[in-house]
C-alpha cells in the first residue's frame, strides 16, 4: 500500500489497510473506518459546531476469536491515537473492591503521554546523538582547564585548533564504530523508580507514591564504567530526555486523549443483567458497573496526574459475545450511547484458509520465518492448508468455538516435533502436506476426548 497520511485516509483506504491484517468482518471494518473518518470531518468544522458533534460509539457483537479486539487495535495503530483496552469485568461499582472505572481514562492518559514523549524524542534524536557524541569525546579527550572559573561548556564551543582536529578524527572513528570496545567513565543519570505494591482499587495512590519517590531521586547521577557501545544509547536517551519539553508533551497528550483517544471495552456482555426474572446480587453489582461507565461515555471530567481529561469526544468501542445476555439487557442509558451495532460472523473453513495465508503476518508465514532462523526451510502445501482449516473448523464445531485462536493450538500441535528437532535439522527442507497433517493430528481429531483436552 502506498504511503498515505493516516489522518486523511478515506473509509475505503482504512478498510483496505485493515484487510491486510484481518480476514473478513467487512461490516465491522466499515463501521470503524467511518468512525475514524468522522473524527477528521469533525476537526474541519468551525469550533462552535465542532464541540457539538459527538462520536458515534460502536458495539461489536460476535463470538470470541473472530477479530473484535484486533480490529480496534489495528485501528488505533493506524490512527496513531492513544488507545487502551480494558475488560469490563475488571471493574466494580464504586465502594466495592476492584478497579474504579475512572482508571480507564488515567491509563489512556498514561498511554498518550508515553506516545507523545516518544514522538518528541524522535524529533530531537539528531541533536541528542550529537550531544551524546560530545560527552563521549569529552571522556576520551578531557579538555584542558585554563584559568580560574573555567567553563567546560564554553570550552566546548571554542576549542583550540589542535583539539578541534583531534576531536574531528576521534568523532569519525566513533561514528565508524572503531572505538566501540573502548571503556570510558561517565556520569550517568540514576533511575529513581521504585516498585510499590498496592491493594486492588488503590492503583492511583500507588502511582502517586511512585511519582513522589521518582521526583525525590531526580537529578542524581553516578559514575559508571561502560564500553562506548553500551554508553551511547544510554547517553542518547538521557540527552533526548533533557531536550524534550515535558509541559508541551503533557499538553499535547491531554489534547490527543480528548480529541483522538480510543477506549476498547471488552466483555461488556458480562456486566449486562441476565434475564428479567428477578434481580440477584450479581445483577445489581453488574448494573452498578454500567452506571459507573455511563458518565465516561456520556462525557465527564476525569482528574489524572497530567491534568483534567474531558471524555466528551473519546471514541468508545465495546464488544461482547452476548451468549447469555442480549444487547437489550444493558441499561437503556448505556444502550443509547452505543448507536452503531455491528454483528461479527463466526468463522468458517474458508475463512480459516484465508487467515492462514492472506494477512501480512499470516500464521504460516510466522512459523516459516521462525524455523528459518534454525536453517530449516519450511513450506506448506495447499492441501495441508486446506486440511488444517478443516480440522480447526471441526474442533470448533464439536467443542467450544474459540474462532481463529484454534489455529494457534492446531499449528503448535502439528509442528511440535519439528520445532523440537529444528536445531538438528539445519539445512533441511520440510514440506508439510495433507498426509503429514493427518499423521500428526488425525488421531486427535477422530477421538473427541483427546481433542477436547489437546486441541
UniProtKB/Swiss-Prot annotation:
The protein's job, in short, is: ATPase subunit of a proteasome-like degradation complex; this subunit has chaperone activity. The binding of ATP and its subsequent hydrolysis by HslU are essential for unfolding of protein substrates subsequently hydrolyzed by HslV. HslU recognizes the N-terminal part of its protein substrates and unfolds these before they are guided to HslV for hydrolysis.
Which family is this sequence assigned to?
Belongs to the ClpX chaperone family. HslU subfamily.
Entry-linked Pfam families: AAA, AAA_2
Subcellular location per UniProt equals: Cytoplasm
For the ligand (ATP), the binding residues are 23, 65-70, 266, 333, 405
Q: Cellular component per GO?
A: HslUV protease complex
Query: Any keyword Nucleotide-binding?
Result: yes
Query: Main localisation, per the record?
Result: cytoplasm
User: What is the protein name for this chain?
Assistant: ATP-dependent protease ATPase subunit HslU
PANTHER family named in the record: ATP-DEPENDENT CLP PROTEASE ATP-BINDING SUBUNIT CLPX-LIKE, MITOCHONDRIAL-RELATED, ATP-DEPENDENT PROTEASE ATPASE SUBUNIT HSLU
Q: Which GO annotations describe the biological process of this protein? A: protein unfolding; proteolysis involved in protein catabolic process
Q: Provide the assembly information.
A: A double ring-shaped homohexamer of HslV is capped on each side by a ring-shaped HslU homohexamer. The assembly of the HslU/HslV complex is dependent on binding of ATP.
Gene encoding this polypeptide? hslU
Report keywords, A-Z. ATP-binding, Chaperone, Cytoplasm, Nucleotide-binding
Q: What is the lineage of its organism?
A: Bacteria, Pseudomonadati, Pseudomonadota, Gammaproteobacteria, Lysobacterales
Read off the HAMAP family from this record. HslU (MF_00249)
Q: InterPro entries from the entry? A: AAA+_ATPase (IPR003593), ATP-dep_Clp_protease_ClpX (IPR050052), ATPase_AAA_core (IPR003959), Clp_ATPase_C (IPR019489), HslU (IPR004491), P-loop_NTPase (IPR027417)
GO terms assigned for molecular function:
ATP binding; ATP hydrolysis activity; peptidase activity; proteasome-activating activity
The keyword Transmembrane helix is assigned to this record: no
Amino acid at each position: 500500500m502506498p504511503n498515505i497520511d493516516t489522518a486523511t485516509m478515506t473509509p475505503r483506504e482504512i478498510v483496505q489497510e485493515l484487510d491486510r491484517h484481518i480476514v473478513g468482518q467487512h461490516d465491522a471494518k466499515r463501521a470503524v473506518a467511518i468512525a475514524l473518518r468522522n473524527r477528521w470531518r469533525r476537526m474541519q468544522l468551525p469550533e462552535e459546531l465542532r464541540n457539538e458533534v459527538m462520536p458515534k460509539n460502536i458495539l461489536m457483537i460476535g463470538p470470541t476469536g473472530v477479530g473484535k479486539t484486533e480490529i480496534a487495535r489495528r485501528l488505533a495503530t493506524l490512527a496513531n491515537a492513544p488507545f487502551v483496552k480494558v475488560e469490563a469485568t475488571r471493574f466494580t461499582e464504586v465502594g466495592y473492591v476492584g478497579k474504579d472505572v475512572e482508571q480507564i481514562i488515567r491509563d489512556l492518559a498514561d498511554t498518550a503521554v508515553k506516545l507523545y514523549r516518544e514522538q518528541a524524542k524522535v524529533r530531537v534524536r539528531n541533536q541528542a546523538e550529537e550531544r551524546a557524541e560530545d560527552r563521549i569525546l569529552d571522556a576520551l579527550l578531557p579538555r584542558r582547564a585554563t584559568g580560574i572559573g573555567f567553563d567546560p561548556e564554553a570550552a566546548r564551543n571554542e576549542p583550540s585548533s589542535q583539539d578541534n582536529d583531534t576531536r574531528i578524527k576521534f568523532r569519525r572513528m566513533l561514528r565508524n564504530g572503531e572505538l566501540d570496545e573502548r571503556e570510558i567513565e561517565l556520569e550517568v543519570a540514576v533511575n529513581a523508580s521504585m516498585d510499590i505494591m498496592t491493594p486492588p482499587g488503590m492503583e492511583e495512590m500507588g502511582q502517586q507514591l511512585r511519582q513522589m519517590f521518582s521526583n525525590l531521586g531526580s537529578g542524581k547521577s553516578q559514575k559508571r564504567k561502560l564500553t562506548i557501545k553500551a554508553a551511547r544509547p544510554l547517553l542518547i536517551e538521557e540527552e533526548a530526555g533533557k531536550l524534550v519539553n515535558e509541559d508541551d508533551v503533557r499538553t499535547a497528550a491531554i489534547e490527543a486523549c480528548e480529541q483522538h483517544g480510543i477506549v476498547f471495552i471488552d466483555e461488556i456482555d458480562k456486566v449486562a443483567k441476565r434475564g428479567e426474572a428477578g434481580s440477584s446480587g450479581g445483577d445489581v453489582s453488574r448494573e452498578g458497573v454500567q452506571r459507573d461507565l455511563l458518565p465516561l461515555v456520556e462525557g465527564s471530567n476525569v482528574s489524572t496526574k497530567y491534568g483534567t481529561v474531558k471524555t466528551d469526544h473519546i471514541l468508545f468501542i465495546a464488544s461482547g459475545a452476548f451468549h447469555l445476555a442480549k444487547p437489550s439487557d444493558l441499561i437503556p442509558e448505556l444502550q443509547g450511547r452505543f448507536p452503531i451495532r455491528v454483528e461479527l460472523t463466526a468463522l468458517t473453513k474458508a475463512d480459516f484458509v484465508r487467515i492462514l495465508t492472506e494477512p501480512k503476518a499470516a500464521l504460516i508465514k510466522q512459523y516459516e520465518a521462525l524455523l528459518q532462523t534454525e536453517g530449516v526451510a519450511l513450506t506448506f502445501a495447499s492441501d495441508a492448508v486446506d486440511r488444517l482449516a478443516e480440522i480447526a473448523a471441526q474442533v470448533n464445531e464439536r467443542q467450544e468455538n474459540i474462532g481463529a485462536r484454534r489455529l494457534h493450538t492446531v499449528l503448535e500441535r502439528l509442528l511440535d516435533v519439528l520445532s523440537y528437532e529444528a536445531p538438528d535439522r539445519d539445512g533441511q527442507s520440510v514440506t508439510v502436506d495433507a498426509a503429514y497433517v493427518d499423521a500428526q493430528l488425525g488421531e486427535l481429531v477422530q477421538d473427541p476426548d483427546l481433542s477436547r483436552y489437546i486441541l
